[in-house]
Amino acid sequence: MSSSENFVIALDGGSGTGKSTTAKLVAKTLGITYLDTGAMYRAVTLAALDKGLAAEEGPAMDELLKNLDLGFDSENHILINGVSRESEIRGMKVSSNVSIYCALPSVRAAMTEKQREIGKKQSCILDGRDIGTVVFPDAKYKFFMVTDVKVRAERRYKELLEKGEKVTLEEVLNNLVERDRLDSSRTNAPLKKADDAIEIDTTHISIQQQVQKILDYVGVVA
């Protein structure tokens, strides 16, 4: 891998597969930018819920997207119109609605444009559902992460409990199953593995092993 050329690493997969944690560590190891695209979609969802907007196309949603200022602070936490809402976007309220809002063509178009703007300026790793198929179909490196849904549910359940959320394991599991269904079946930019992506099953491996697999393919020794 040349250190002088800009490149994109596309990391796709379903909810709870460890994409974000893995992407952050890969970015840190390589010294490149990490773009949390999932946080961007969660931020749009939270902003829409704040305003009581239904998940449908129309002038109200267009106006929201037009005036929505998304950014990240020094710790890579999402900023919505300059205000950190990191803890709120990770809650079950947003998790239960994000797949519905992010399926809207206007939302995906707006977020895809923002993601491409960032990715064209610097080397970066992006994690999401359609990075390797839609956002950066010509990305130099593409990976697709899969994990048994019960394992994903247990991981997410533990995370939510640590954050003080009152939720049951069954609720988390049902939420993941439904999100998988919505993400994979939507017409616009569905969750699917790019033909040229490397699949990584994270069910029985640690985060560090996930990171190392990507670094091995990229050609870097951690």
Model-derived segments and spans:
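N-terminal phosphate/diphosphate-binding loop that engages ATP/GTP or pyrophosphate donors
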Residues: 28-91
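Residue-level signal for inorganic ion chemistry
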Residues: 38, 82, 111, 125, ...
